[in-house]
Amino acid sequence: MSSESKTKTFLEFQFAMLLISGNILFAKLIDESVWMITFGRTVFASVGLYLFLKWRDKPVFFTTKTDNIASLGAGVLLAVHWITFFASARLASPAVAVLTLFTHPVITVFLEPIHFASRPKKTDLFLALLVLLGVGILIPELKPGNDLFLGILSGLFSAFTFSYRNLVAKKFLSHHGSAQVMFLQSLTAAILLAPVCYWDPIPTNYRSLGLMILLGTFFTAFAHTLYMKSMFQLKLKTAGILSSIQPVYSILLAWILLGDIPGYREIIGGVLILFAGTLETIRYKKEVP
């Protein structure tokens, strides 16, 4: 990969991270259940990506059984990831949800060698632990059994499913277009979550519907497609550590848009996460393909 291509991939990845960071704001902005928010975003993401693929005259389904099964599995993982992510935000706080989710670089560093012919380098382990330390500083004192503790557990499970979804997509689906990959994952998640309509009424007010459309099309379909496109060009551990910037983006967005002022924990933890991300960025640009 040329230096120009690396820079383009890096910028696309960071823009995707900025957009995905905005997802957590919708947990506060949309007055609906976690299940309905997740179902709504998957439906509108699927519709948006389907129309895009048809407009570009691209296929919407894969031709091989293996790819379709992999896409189904990735879609299930994505649905669980989104549900547990928003549940973490509701149980604890948006900040805790984002920060526990971004233990996923640590998880990725240890999962990737299991499925790919590679071994984690000492630098990878150091950066992963640095990210974990940064996240640990950001999280206040725990008391098992309370909402904060349950929110953190939910966030950690969300991190695991996110890491495994990325691994499945990278290993089995990276030879396909990112929009097609994301469409099938979103469609699978939407079908899986459809039963929520039996116990949770579909919102009828324009505000909730409008925010769900925005979340599903721009902050999910577009953002995650761009993320997948960039991720396919990177090593999973590199993508994981570079994405550690997302908690910082989320804290800044919450500060600017919701008035949530970061405390000293957020500042110190954010600096450590930024430091790890900066080191990985320098390594990424120096790597020889």
Label every PLM stretch briefly.
Residues 36, 43-44, 86-119, 158, ...:
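Specific alpha-helical transmembrane segments that line the substrate/conduction pathway
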Residues 30, 37, 41, 88, ...:
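Hydrophobic/aromatic residues within transmembrane alpha-helices
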Residues 1-40, 47, 73-76, 84, ...:
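Glycine-/small-residue-enriched transmembrane alpha-helix faces in small-molecule transporters
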Residues 97-103, 169-189, 220-256:
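Helix-helix packing/entry segments at the starts of transmembrane helices
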Residues 9, 32-80, 105-111, 161-165, ...:
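Transmembrane alpha-helices of multi-pass small-molecule transport proteins
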